[in-house]
UniProtKB/Swiss-Prot annotation:
GO terms for biological process: cell wall organization; peptidoglycan biosynthetic process; regulation of cell shape. The active site is at C77, C188. Keywords: Cell shape, Cell wall biogenesis/degradation, Isomerase, Peptidoglycan synthesis. InterPro entries: Asp/Glu/hydantoin_racemase, Asp/Glu_race, Asp/Glu_racemase_AS_1, Asp/Glu_racemase_AS_2, Glu_race. It comes from the Bacteria. This is Glutamate racemase. Belongs to the aspartate/glutamate racemases family. Substrate binds at D13, S14, Y45, S46, N78, T79, T189, H190. The gene is murI. It comes from Pasteurella multocida (strain Pm70). Pathway: Cell wall biogenesis; peptidoglycan biosynthesis. SUPFAM superfamilies: Aspartate/glutamate racemase. Its EC number is 5.1.1.3. The keyword Cell wall biogenesis/degradation applies.
Length: 269
């Protein structure tokens, strides 16, 4: 990172789960220029086709890059990362970092060799994830649970609403009786944001692993190898694709996470 200027990094997700990845990166690299975009008009991505996700993600990243030249993009969404990375890397000359379920570290730390992958419905069914399991967790029994409801619960928490523990427990019910399940992969960036609540529902689980710290280290490594293109002292900004009813409450949320302004992207323009 041979530049007096701070790099501009875009974090992208369909919702606000990417805050968990952004948090780890900002702790490691506090002085970067951070942009965050959540495509709430298209939320959740787990319910969309692969082609829709690819076209939507590419269009939004291009639009932001035209106004705020980017040095690095983090796709802070496991579902999107399983399908969009080749298209983004083909279009952008800058590094694009994806979010991969932490199957390998989970398999390494599990003592019972019985692990669970908690992710979105879209992520658990991808061939990419099956390949990760085959490569890194061949000696493990791997339970897979795909949930849209947990994503919604995490979003509600970020909007300042109480977590519905009854609904959370119901969603995790298939795993509550598996006593030798000792490690859970939080395979959606939303889930670290409700990790304590998930722990309460699964008391037998000893280890919860996610990709946040590994992504932060990857970002640091990549930035050390590139020349910074953006020359800006802009404040940290957050983008959405449609405004919502509790916008006033959400302004408090974005300031808490270190962003100065919420901007609505007009994707029809």
């Amino acid at each position: 990172m041979n530049s007096p200027y701070q790099p501009t990094i875009l974090f992208f997700d369909s919702g606000m789960g990417g805050f968990s990845v952004y948090k780890e990166t900002k702790q490691l690299l506090p002085d970067c220029h951070y942009l965050y975009c959540f495509d709430n008009a298209f939320f959740p991505y787990s319910e969309k086709s692969e082609e829709e996700i690819i076209q939507r993600t590419l269009k939004i990243c291009q639009k932001i890059d035209r106004t705020f030249p980017l040095d690095l993009i983090v796709i802070a969404c496991n579902t999107a990362s399983t399908v969009v990375l080749p298209a983004l890397r083909a279009h952008f000359a800058i590094p694009v970092v994806g979010t991969v379920p932490a199957i390998k570290p989970a398999a390494e730390c599990s003592e019972t060799k019985h692990i669970g992958l908690l992710a979105t419905k879209g992520t658990v069914k991808r061939a990419y994830v099956a390949d990760l399991i085959a490569q890194y967790a061949r000696d493990c029994t791997v339970e897979k649970l795909g949930s849209t409801k947990l994503v919604e619960i995490a979003e509600q928490k970020l909007h300042g609403k109480a977590v519905d523990l009854h609904a959370l427990k119901q969603e995790l019910a298939p795993w509550q009786s598996i006593q030798n399940l000792d490690t859970v992969v939080l395979g959606c960036t939303h889930f670290p944001l409700i990790k304590e609540e998930i722990k309460w529902c699964l008391p037998q689980v000893r280890f919860f692993v996610d990709s946040g710290k590994a992504i932060a280290l990857r970002v640091k490594t990549l930035l050390s190898k590139i020349d910074i293109q953006s020359k800006t002292n802009e404040k940290n900004l957050i983008f959405c694709t449609q405004f919502f009813e509790d916008e006033t409450q959400f302004q408090k949320v974005i300031h808490f996470w270190g962003f100065e302004q919420l901007i609505n992207l007009n994707m029809k323009a």
